[in-house]
Amino acid sequence: MLDFLAITLSGKPPQVIQGETVNLKWQWLGEGILTLVPHRSYTQSVVISAGIHGNETAPIEILNQLVTDLLAGQLTLAVRLLVLLGNPPAIRKGKRYLSNDINRMFGGRYQHYTPSDETRRASTLEQRVMAFFQASHTSERLHYDLHTAIRGSYHPRFGLLPYQQTPYSAAMFRWLRDIELDALVMHTSAGGTFAHFSSERCQAASCTLELGKALPFGENQLSQFSAITQGLRSLVSDSALPARKTENMKYYRVVKSLLRQHPDFKLRGAEDTVNFTRFAQGTLLTEQPNDNYRVEHPYEWILFPNPHVALGLRAGMMLVKMCESELPIT
């Protein structure tokens, strides 16, 4: 039986690149790229990606087990499915990326970088996702991009909705609620993420899922992600999810991107600040020549603080809380 992760890590294509089981047909489309189509009728086309950052191993392990169970017949496929391991060379080396962050390159932004394996990979991933959705005759398009965060978080499991000018899918929102996410963050401007690309270019209901902290293979406690794992299994098999057991999600929207625009950029407490740390109005957060930032709202929460990014890139995002009723959902 095809071992999706092992073959991808080997750097060699499988000897057999397509086949079928009792329940589905599968096809290897390239390194870390696999389609699975059920024999039965279906109404959804779903993309699940992991490993855009090579050191984020928990989502890779979760996705690989999902593929293994589908191919073994332990889980019955009910959707048209594309699974992607985003950056195989970085996965092999246990690195976030080798030259540049792929998750800033989508939407054609890779063309502004020095050509590399990662710019070419971003282009390939875009082409495969567009071709997958364009060949679909289904009414529903979904994309979940699985990640883990660099540092700890007051909300260990959270989602990021890409900015879009149309309302978000109510069905996606219900699924995100039922997989026990602690928080949901709404972007308020366009970006170079994979989820933003599939939302903007392919009109997919898309979300980036952050599952805990980045750890090496074999060191993940996957039990803490059991609700999300079950959610993915439920999604691809079209089975019901149990009702949410934990307290309700918290909701945030982005109000400020903190850009590192000078070599002397400083970010307050950056080395030990965890995601969703709260700061009061007036707190000085960043310093750089001619551009300091103080918290403007009564309270703001920081996400993805990283003062070591390259010049011109985002060193963090500031959030404010919002109510569920403020989310644009249809």
From Swiss-Prot:
Pfam families: AstE_AspA_cat, AstE_AspA_hybrid. Gene3D superfamilies: Zn peptidases. Its EC number is 3.5.1.96. The keyword Metal-binding applies. Binds 1 zinc ion per subunit. It is an enzyme of class 3 (hydrolase). The keyword Hydrolase applies. Keywords: Arginine metabolism, Hydrolase, Metal-binding, Zinc. Pathway: Amino-acid degradation; L-arginine degradation via AST pathway; L-glutamate and succinate from L-arginine: step 5/5. It catalyses: N-succinyl-L-glutamate + H2O = L-glutamate + succinate. Its cofactor is Zn(2+). Belongs to the AspA/AstE family. Succinylglutamate desuccinylase subfamily. HAMAP family: Arg_catab_AstE (MF_00767). Transforms N(2)-succinylglutamate into succinate and glutamate. This is Succinylglutamate desuccinylase. It comes from Yersinia pseudotuberculosis serotype O:3 (strain YPIII). The lineage of its organism: Bacteria, Pseudomonadati, Pseudomonadota, Gammaproteobacteria, Enterobacterales. The gene is astE.
